[in-house]
Amino acid sequence: MCSSDLAEREALQSTLDGNSVELLLAFTQALRRARRIFIAAHDFSRFPAGYLEHRLLSLELDCCILDLQARQDMFRRLSAQPPQDGLLIAITVPPYGNDTIALTRYCASIGMPVAALTDRPDSPVARCAQTTLLCHVELMGMTNSFTSMVGLVDTLAMLYTFTSGAPTQEEKTCRDTLHRKFDSCFSDPNTSI
């Protein structure tokens, strides 16, 4: 095993050891309570944010990554429902993005629950979050490892499923039937004149 693989494994182990089961369950409860989940991330954090979105969508949760550059679109999405029905998941590691921090502060100020995936308890987004999970992301003195965040996302998805938050088989069957009917509406050749 090469030294970088060992370092990645140690980073993941450190992350899993540093987050209690209670913290992980609190994060999954926040997911369960939210009608809509918003994910904010920038630069390095966008990869784990995309993976988190993929995993949450596979659990049939309503979520989206916010485009931090499209402020009017962000505002439209965030204001489409009462703030208490949403959840902002802020993902940030050094250098912390000003837009991610500003959005986190805004959501906290309007009463939207905030959860954070970050590297330190004193990170700017952790100060605004009700639930914070810490990830070891530094290898060889640089922020360059997202293995621990991806591992933590997988852990959260499994916990969500194991704590009965995932759709039942009956719900999945009904959704699959609706999906097939939806697809069949578009399977006929276009007959418009």
Name each model-derived stretch.
Residues 1-3:
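Short, small-residue-biased leader/transition segments that mark boundaries at the very start
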Residues 5, 24, 49, 171-172:
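Hydrophobic packing residues in well-ordered alpha-helices of helical domains and bundles
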Residues 7-16:
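Glycine-rich phosphate-binding "P-loop"
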Residues 15-33:
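A short, well-structured juxtamembrane/interface segment
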Residues 35-151, 155-165:
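Glycine-rich phosphate-binding loops that contact phosphosugars or nucleotide phosphates
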Residues 166-193:
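A short, charged, Gly/Pro-tolerant segment at domain boundaries
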